[in-house]
Amino acid sequence: MKTPKTLLLIIAALLFAACEKYEAEDVAQTESKVVDGNLVVTAECLVTKSGVEDEETATLPLNERFTRMSMVIYQNDVRVDYVNQVNTDKDFGTMSVDLEPGTYQLVVLAHSGTRSPTTTNCHKISFSAPLTDVFSYYGEITVGKEANKISVQLARAVAKIQLNIKDDIPANVSFFNFIYKGASVSFDPTTKVGLASSTRRNMEIEKVEGVKTFELYTFVTGADQLVDLDVAGYSEAKDVVGAKKFPGISVELRKVSKIDSPVFDGVIEGPTDISVILDDTWDGVIDYTF
C-alpha cells in the first residue's frame, strides 16, 4: 500500500470550522447504551478508501477507514435517541437502540473527526474541526416489538479540494497561511446538501518537510458553489516568501477539485484549465492546472 506525502485535515481543521460555531450536544439527553435493542443497524461502505492506491474498501474494516461513527434516530424530525462510537469500540459499525414500535428516520454517519457531530437538528448536522471525509446514510424505518436487524450502505457526503504544489518549497518557508472562502461544515443528511458557508483568515500551518499535497473537505451547498483559496508561505520572520490565489474553484458532491500549481513562481494569480477525469475512489476529478 502506497502512502502519499499528504498533509490532510490539519489544515481543514482550521479552515472549515472557523466561522460556523460548533454547538455542543444538550446534556439533558445522553446517548443510548443499549447493547441488544429491538433495532440493530450495521453499516457498510463499499467505496475505495480515499488516498489509498490499488486497495479496495471491501478488504478494509470500518475501524481502519474511520475513527468515529454515529447512529441517530428521529421521529417527525425530533431526535429520540443516538449512539456515538469510536473505532476502538467492540463491534464498531454495529449499533443498537431500544425503541417503541413506530416509524422513524435513521441517520448513520462515519468520519474521522476529533469529536462527534451535533445531531440535535435532523436537517442540520454540524461537524467540529477538522472536517474529514464524511460518509452518511438516511432512510425511514419501521420498528416493531421484535428485534429488527438491518444493514445500511454509506455514501460519501462531501467534496474534496486537493492542492498539489508543483514547485520546490523554499527552505526558508516556516509556515503556510490559508484563506478559504465558500466552504461548509454543516449539511442536511436527508439531501446531502451543505448549509452554511464559512470564512477563516490568518491560520498558520507549520511546514512539514516533504509535504506538498493538501486535502480539504467541504459539504456542497449547491450546483453553483465556488470556493476561493489563497495560499501563502511565510518565513520565520513572517515575511511572505511566495503566494498564490485560486479563485472560483467549483466543487461537486463526491468529486475532487484537484489543483496542480506552483506557489513560489512569483505569479499571484493565473488562468485555469478544467477537465473532469474518472477516478476509482470518487465519482470524478475536476482537474485545475495553474
Question: Which residues does each PLM region occupy?
Answer:
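Tryptophan-paired
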Residues: L60-T120, N172-L253, D280-F290
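C-terminal motif of bacterial Sec signal peptides marking the signal peptidase cleavage site
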Residues: L15-A18
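Bacterial N-terminal signal peptides that target proteins for export
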Residues: M1-L8
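Surface-exposed interaction/gating patches
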Residues: R156-S174, A183
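Structured interaction patches on ligand/partner-binding surfaces of diverse proteins
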Residues: Y22, Q85-D91, G113-K149, E236-V267
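Short amphipathic, basic-aromatic surface patches that mediate peripheral association
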Residues: A24-A28, V34-L62, I165-I169
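Intrinsically disordered, low-complexity repeat and linker tracts
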Residues: E20-V34, P262-F290
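Conserved "repeat-terminator" motif of extracellular CCP/Sushi domains
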Residues: S151-V158, L216-G222
